[in-house]
């Protein structure tokens, strides 16, 4: 079986030769070809070379267009890139440091906005070069993560209490953008869209259920309607929201090393495909 066939067989409940291997590789992939991570994160040509080389070297079953956030800089966020560490949002100059700016924020077009368009180019190239052998995965930011990129993570955490109506309006914007961007990635060649929502593990179960879950569900449903399989990735401990995650109906749910796989299985149910939960420091 090819890697693509292996992943799709698993998701469709069909026989397969062995479980697929589909880790998230970003800085690791850049390292494999000697590229600076800051370049990998903004240049689809470097990303494609790194993804293909890494997948073929280690026998991974997918290639992914995941880099740093592409939506935020195209919405005016001040993003700092580094050679050998992940990006950072300049919260002192957050694009939505003033809440009034949300009403003036224009929805960028993924087909022409510089950063999102670069990812589309990368996915099209991945599809052309290895799309028959490897599953091609795109990526969008989830509502909590995307909102934090625009507002600043610390400010957003206060907004949940100080101005919940603003949070809902902001989530409306970022989810609409996520669906639009995800649809464009499917058209470019992605068969699966990952949803990265790391900040969702920081808000606690009450706020997650009130604010985050409904918008994650809308995003997942929108990506499914676009023809994509959906993979949810929430970093950190999701122990207290696992049952809610199981109700999102994602095709794959990533399980971080902070969450026992047995607990994830118990809470999400017997049919949910789970991916993880290797500790990249201790185990690797």
What are these language model-derived features?
Residues 65-75, 138-145:
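Short, glycine/charge-rich beta-strand/loop segments that flank catalytic centers
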Residues 1-29, 35-40, 50, 61, ...:
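Active-site loop segments of alpha/beta catalytic cores
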Residues 26-30, 69-72:
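Short active-site-proximal "capping" loops at secondary-structure junctions
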Residues 69-111, 132-133:
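A contiguous, low-structure linker/loop signature
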Residues 40-69:
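Segments that shape or occlude catalytic/ligand-binding pockets
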